Amino acid sequence: MPDFPPKPSVKADIAIIGGSGLYDPGVLENAKEYKIYTPYGEPSDYIIVGELGGKRVAFLPRHGRGHRIPPHKINYRANIWALKMLGVKWVIAVSAVGSLREDYKPGDIVVPDQFIDMTKSRVYTFFDEGIVAHVSMADPFCEHLRQEIISTARELGYRVHPRGTYICIEGPRFSTRAESRVWREVFKADIIGMTLVPEVNLACEAQLCYATIALVTDYDVWAERPVTAEEVARVMKENTEKAKKILYKLIPRLPPEPDKARCSCCSSLETALL
């Protein structure tokens, strides 16, 4: 078993995991940086802890500031473990994704309810030595948190899709045209990205309420239409501002503790351990 470092003295109720384009939350007051050590190594970056709407909030840029860590090299276990050490109950992940559907347009927000894992070489569990756990992933996202995100995005007037299947590929390369057509036509996935897995299953093992704000930047290559870097950069900038506004409005309304009547995230291990 790995050595367990002492728990940090700082605490947080809610965590934001920032994806491509969101390297600084920009909404936290009295923010300070903390270096957190975990038995699985170091997280992607220093964790920023501050306040928003009376809540203690932790922010972690998934790729590190400056986008220096590719998807397949992210230390997902260290990231999730560090948030657990801080006492986090809620995890709001933000991700840039490509669209596999005509009606999921660049600039739209998707709050996925399912995923398909097409990654190949990542570490998927905390339970790989001495203890075996089989967590249920039938409904992989916290439904309570999903509904809060959806209602907040709608209140702000954004185009939001309340359901969607996220297919997670290994990266860092993008799909071929043939692969993209398979994801769309055979697997019936709606959006595509590179970072959801194993983040989502590790959050489940850590008994955290986890949901994703997926921000559509462009159509994947199935669409066979030209996409310029300029256009993607413009949409990503707009999406980042949308994400910040959602977080600013959403976080103050989350209760300190998840409602066990509305979600089972915090008891995911009760039926998982053998």
UniProtKB/Swiss-Prot annotation:
Q: What is its EC number?
A: 2.4.2.28
> Which superkingdom is the protein from?
Archaea
Task: Give the residues the record marks as binding phosphate.
Answer: 20, 62-63, 95-96, 195
Keyword annotations for this protein, in alphabetical order, are: Glycosyltransferase, Purine salvage, Transferase
Site (described: Important for substrate specificity)? 175, 229
Residue positions annotated to bind substrate are 194, 218-220
Gene3D superfamilies named among the record's database cross-references: Nucleoside phosphorylase domain (3.40.50.1580)
Function in brief: Catalyzes the reversible phosphorylation of S-methyl-5'-thioadenosine (MTA) to adenine and 5-methylthioribose-1-phosphate. Involved in the breakdown of MTA, a major by-product of polyamine biosynthesis. Responsible for the first step in the methionine salvage pathway after MTA has been generated from S-adenosylmethionine. Has broad substrate specificity with 6-aminopurine nucleosides as preferred substrates.
- NCBIfam families on file: MTAP, PRK08564.1, PRK09136.1
Similarity field: Belongs to the PNP/MTAP phosphorylase family. MTAP subfamily.
The molecule here is called S-methyl-5'-thioadenosine phosphorylase
Q: Which organism is it from?
A: Hyperthermus butylicus (strain DSM 5456 / JCM 9403 / PLM1-5)
Which taxonomic lineage does the organism of this UniProt entry have?
Archaea, Thermoproteota, Thermoprotei, Desulfurococcales, Pyrodictiaceae
Q: Which gene encodes it?
A: mtnP
